[in-house]
Amino acid sequence: GVDINAIETTENREKFRLRMKELGVGVCEGSIATSFLEGKEIAQRIGFPLVIRPSYTLGGSGGGFVQKAEDFDAALNRGLHASPIHEVLVEQSILGWKEYELELLRDGAGNVIIICSIENFDPMGIHTGDSITVAPAMTLPDTVYQNMRDLAIKMMNGIGKFAGGCNVQFSVNPDSDEIIGIEINPRVSRSSALASKATGYPIAKIAAKLAIGYHLDELGNAITGSTTAYFEPTLDYVIVKIPRWNFDKFVGADRKLGLQMKSVGEVMGIGRNFQEALQKACQSLEIRRNGLGADGKELTKQEELLRSLENPSWNRLFHIYDAMKLGISMKTILSLTKIDKWFLLQIEELIELEKEIEKYEVGTIPASLMRTAKEKGYADRQIAHLLNCLESEVHKKRKEMGINRV
C-alpha cells in the first residue's frame, strides 16, 4: 500500500513542488508561507492574480484565487487557519487553463496502467469536485496525451515505490499545450470512483489486492473472465459527471464556485456521444429540469446571463445554453467562460436541432429527425415541449416509428 513518505510528498506543498522540479515536471511559480508576513512577501514577488493552497486539507478547504491586492490579507488568513500545520502555498494563477486527470494503478513489480483520462468541462479555477467532467478526455490531442501519460507515470514512480491506485491532475495551456502538474493523490479518490464506474474496471478492489502483494498479471479480469487485470480499458461511449449542489439548504452561502468544493453529490450520464451523456446527466439532477433546456425555464435577461457566465455558479451550464438561445455571440461566451470551444459548439448544435424540431407538429415530424433527437439524449418530455404536444403523444409516435430505447 501507500507509504507515509508518498503522503508526505504529495500533501506537503513545498515538498511536492521540489520533487516535481527534480523530476522535470512543470509546476507553477510559488513558495510556501507559514506566517502572514511570509505570505505578503511572496505575493509582492509573484504579483496578482495568484492562488492560495493550504497544506493537508481536503476538498480545497481554505484555498482560493485572489485577483486584487486588497483581497489578499483575508484570503491568506483563511488559508493559514484552514491548514492544520499553519502552512499555505502561494503561487501564480493559471486561471483559464484546461484541467485533466489520469487514473493510474501500479503493482509491486513496477507495472503501471492508465485506467482512464478525465477532462474538466470547466477550466482551472473551479475545484475538480465542483466541475463538470467528461471521460474519456474529448479535446486532448494525442501528442499532448502521450506526454501527459509519460509525466503521470514519472510522477507516480517519483513519489515512492508503493502499489495501488493514484490520481494525477494536470493543467494544460490552451494556446501552447504546456503541461503543468497540479497535484497527486496517492490513493483511491473520488475521481477513482468515477473512473471505475465509467470503465467498469474495479479500481478499489484491484488496488486493495495490489497493496497486499499481488501483481496485475496475477489477477483475473472480471469483465472477460479469461484475461488478466493487466490491461487498459478502451471506451466506445462517453461519461459526463455533473455535481449536485444544495445551496437552498444553506441560506446565505456564497454560491460562486472556486477552489473550495461545495457540491454534496454528483450524477453520471452515459451516452454514445457527449451530447447524449450531457442531456442524461442533466435529466438525473432532480432539479425539475427536463434536460439541458427545451423545458420553458430559460433565463432571458441578458445582463444576468453575462454576469453568470463570468462568475461560475451551479447553474452556469444552463446559462450557457440560455445565452446561446438569446443570441449572445460564441466569442463573448468563450471569452467569459474560458470553456473549450468544442464543448460550446456541442451545445450550439443542440439549439440548432431544437429550431429544426420546432418547425413540425407531432404528426408531421420526420422519423430521421426524431431519431437524431433521441440519439442526442432528448427525453420525450423535451421533444413534446418543442412540438407543443403531450409527452404521451411523442411516446406513441416514437413507438410507431420503431425508435426504442436501448
Named regions from a protein language model:
Residues 53, 333, 383:
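Conserved hydrophobic/aromatic pocket- or pore-lining residues that grip, position, or stack substrates
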